[in-house]
């Protein structure tokens, strides 16, 4: 995915997709929760933190994230987002063959791995 920033006299806009098949979600995490440590075979993902200060893992890198931080996740790349004392919300844009079953869970605190 190629992100485009276009400057205008009134400010700017960021374009995340252009005539591409994609699935767009805003995901809300409760405090003290986490997605599985997982990967996908058939899609890439882009995450942009909207609110909160989640802990984001992409590959071998773990980041204490803040609103506005962005992350790109390749096919087969392990990733997770988790919260501690506060909830968080993030934008997810998935490209490729999107299927909710295309999740390989490596670790999961809810017993789904």
Identify the residue ranges that each predicted region occupies.
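Double-stranded beta-helix
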Residues: 1-8, 80-113
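A short glycine-rich, His/Asp/Glu-containing loop-to-beta-strand
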Residues: 2-39, 43
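Short, conserved beta-strand element in jelly-roll/cupin
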Residues: 27-30, 39-56, 93-96
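Active-site donor-binding loop signature of nucleotide-sugar glycosyltransferases
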Residues: 29-31, 67, 75, 83, ...
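Structural motif
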Residues: 34, 46, 53-55, 78, ...
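Short acidic-glycine-tyrosine-enriched beta hairpin
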Residues: 59-78
């Amino acid at each position: 995915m190629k992100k485009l920033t276009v400057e205008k006299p009134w400010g700017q806009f960021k374009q995340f997709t252009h005539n591409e098949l994609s699935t767009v979600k805003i995901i809300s995490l409760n405090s003290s929760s986490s997605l599985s440590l997982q990967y996908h075979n058939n899609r890439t993902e882009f995450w942009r933190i909207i609110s909160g200060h989640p802990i984001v893992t992409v590959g071998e890198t773990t980041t204490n994230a803040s609103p506005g931080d962005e992350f790109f996740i390749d096919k087969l790349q392990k990733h997770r987002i988790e919260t501690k004392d506060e909830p968080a919300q993030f934008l997810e844009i998935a490209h490729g063959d999107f299927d909710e079953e295309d999740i390989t869970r490596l670790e999961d605190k809810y017993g789904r791995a």
